[in-house]
Amino acid sequence: MAQRYIGLLSGTSMDAVDAALVELEPLRILATHSIPISLALRQQLFAVIERSTTSLGELGALDIRLGRLFAETALELLAKAKCSVTEVQAIGSHGQTIYHWARGPDPFTLQLADPNTIAEITGITTIADFRRRDLAAGGQGAPLAPAFHAAFLRSPHYHRAVLNIGGIANISFLPADHRTPIWGFDTGPGNTLMDGWISRHLNQSIDREGRWAASGRVNKTLLRYLLTDPYFSLPPPKSTGREYFNLVWLDHILSKTGIKLSPPDVQATLCALTIASVKLAIQSSSPHTEELLICGGGANNETLMEGLRKQLAFCRVTTTTAYGIPPQWVEACTFAWLAKQTLEGHPGNLPEVTGARHPVILGAIYPANAAVSSRT
């Protein structure tokens, strides 16, 4: 039987924990499952992220609660798939990013969802904390997805790019010539600003299908101001997060410029910002890109997808579904694959992407509790 792995993560929207049960080499998705994050837990997480201070007790409690929720998601996934824990080699858990700051003399990243708890409850060896070893080696700790994209989505026929639109958007450039290294970076905000803005004004977690953005009009003056942020002109390797691109950042620009817009017009402009920053990334880094594959939650935003197709008319824009991986499950598959890389002693980072001094084996291994495994 082919080896099976589980990938677990919660994205920057923090609306659910996603899990995928996969076989690798070749990749086959056996089952997927999501558990919504309760409003109370979500509000606690946002409060920790948005406040400049929090108590160690609060942080520790959230770590355990998320660990239990991640474990519950994995077990429900296995029940759905009628798969025993003994059939699973490992869980790759990204956790929930609370902070990611790759600049300055002391770069660090922090993800919650205690892997000890996950391993103990599930009885499955769990690999977690994937980003910090790359940071220790001088890298950005992100993006990590390009290594997975290269393994499963590279084409010998096309200069292809893969764009993951989560809270932050990251892109991988995959040259057709396999002798040419791939590269990639975070392009800037994906959904995070749009999610935050609609939450503030309509108390909704996401702009479903981009309908609210579609109801507004893009303000070109505001868009130009947003694009003057230094991040967009930084050369790669580079990474960013909601610590930087957030509503505080947006409010500062709105206040500084004095531009008065309706909330839907701001939403339309934020959608245009994601599109424009992606276009800038492609034109400056790989203008000969022939095909762009979209994955992540942004693939469900019709307004965003339509804008990308219009602005990137020089290449074919589609989703990863065309190549057998549903867009919403690419990241979960990525961490399942990274778990396998770690267990087998293979590096999971790409120094040409993250800027690390050398390839490194990512993450820490939390062995299964044999007593729990034997009962399942």
From Swiss-Prot:
Its EC number is 2.7.1.170. The keyword Electron transport does not apply. Keywords: ATP-binding, Carbohydrate metabolism, Kinase, Nucleotide-binding, Transferase. ATP binds at G11, T12, S13, M14, D15, A16, V17, D18. The keyword Protease does not apply. InterPro entries: Anhydro_N_Ac-Mur_kinase, ATPase_NBD. GO terms for biological process: 1,6-anhydro-N-acetyl-beta-muramic acid catabolic process; amino sugar metabolic process; peptidoglycan turnover. It catalyses: 1,6-anhydro-N-acetyl-beta-muramate + ATP + H2O = N-acetyl-D-muramate 6-phosphate + ADP + H(+). Coiled coil: none annotated. GO terms for molecular function: ATP binding; kinase activity; phosphotransferase activity, alcohol group as acceptor. Pathway: Amino-sugar metabolism; 1,6-anhydro-N-acetylmuramate degradation; Cell wall biogenesis; peptidoglycan recycling. It is an enzyme of class 2 (transferase). Catalyzes the specific phosphorylation of 1,6-anhydro-N-acetylmuramic acid (anhMurNAc) with the simultaneous cleavage of the 1,6-anhydro ring, generating MurNAc-6-P. Is required for the utilization of anhMurNAc either imported from the medium or derived from its own cell wall murein, and thus plays a role in cell wall recycling. HAMAP family: AnhMurNAc_kinase. Belongs to the anhydro-N-acetylmuramic acid kinase family. This is Anhydro-N-acetylmuramic acid kinase. The gene is anmK.
